[in-house]
A protein has these predicted regions:
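An exposed, glycine/acidic-rich loop-and-rim segment of catalytic or binding clefts
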Residues: 1-231
Length: 231
């Protein structure tokens, strides 16, 4: 369905996640609105409701390279993340349930850093995630308000993107598992470090950790979440 207004254009998409699909109970009715504003923002609004108790944490896995083809990787991009904590992983790449400080770790992007040196100079730390970031940050928005989660800047094009969300988690992924087998615009292959993802979400594996914000959804509730990519 098309969305049209004075300063907004977009599209509304609906999907019914049927009872038992992938093992999850309940019919989960999901609506996602994608809106482009006159302020150069892409606004993504999620809503969902269910007819039986289930789990729900929706996100977006868009890849961003702000160079517009000038660079095949994001290693020269500069990134800042507005979080002081993260959820560490075990050797099997699963959350441990801990919430640790990013201070004195390679995940500390509280001040802008160039991604290339930040990743390549910390190979041992990022070995578990195939040589790059694939980590979840814990954002300071316990009251559900929109906060600035991250910023990305490309020095070649001068483009800047800010990420805002009302969700408690931000998964940052630097395309460590891309291997060139997928091609994009103009037939160019997507190789390792081709782009970066900012996946706003609930904390990973929250169903197994009671101290994480709940991802349970009940029939009398409406799930809602908002993410903004501002340019």
């Amino acid at each position: 369905e098309k969305i049209s207004g004075h300063s907004i254009k977009g599209v509304s998409l609906n999907y019914l996640y049927k009872d038992g699909q992938e093992g999850f109970p309940g019919n989960l009715n999901i609506t996602v609105n994608y809106k482009l504003t006159d302020e150069r923002q892409l606004v993504i609004e999620y809503t969902a409701f269910t007819d039986a108790p289930t789990l729900c944490s929706l996100t977006n896995h868009s890849y961003f390279n702000l160079s517009a083809g000038k660079s095949p990787t994001i290693l020269e991009h500069e990134m800042q993340v507005g979080a002081n904590f993260y959820t560490p992983l075990d050797k099997k790449f699963r959350p441990t349930g801990e919430i640790l400080s990013v201070k004195n770790t390679p995940l500390d992007f509280s001040k802008p850093k160039v991604l290339g040196p930040a990743i390549l100079e910390n190979k041992e730390f990022f070995e578990i995630s195939n040589g790059g970031l694939d980590h979840n940050y814990v954002l300071p928005n316990a009251n559900g308000a929109l906060v600035k989660a991250a910023s990305l800047r490309d020095p070649l094009s001068g483009r800047i993107m800010d990420v805002y969300t009302d969700q408690p988690g931000l998964q940052v992924y630097t395309s460590n598992f891309l291997d060139g087998s997928i091609s994009g615009k103009f037939g160019k292959p997507y190789n390792k470090y081709a782009a970066v993802c900012f996946e706003t979400q609930k904390l990973p594996d929250a169903a197994n950790f009671g101290h994480f914000p709940s991802i349970e959804l009940y029939p009398d509730q409406i799930y809602s979440a908002t993410t903004v990519y501002a340019f």
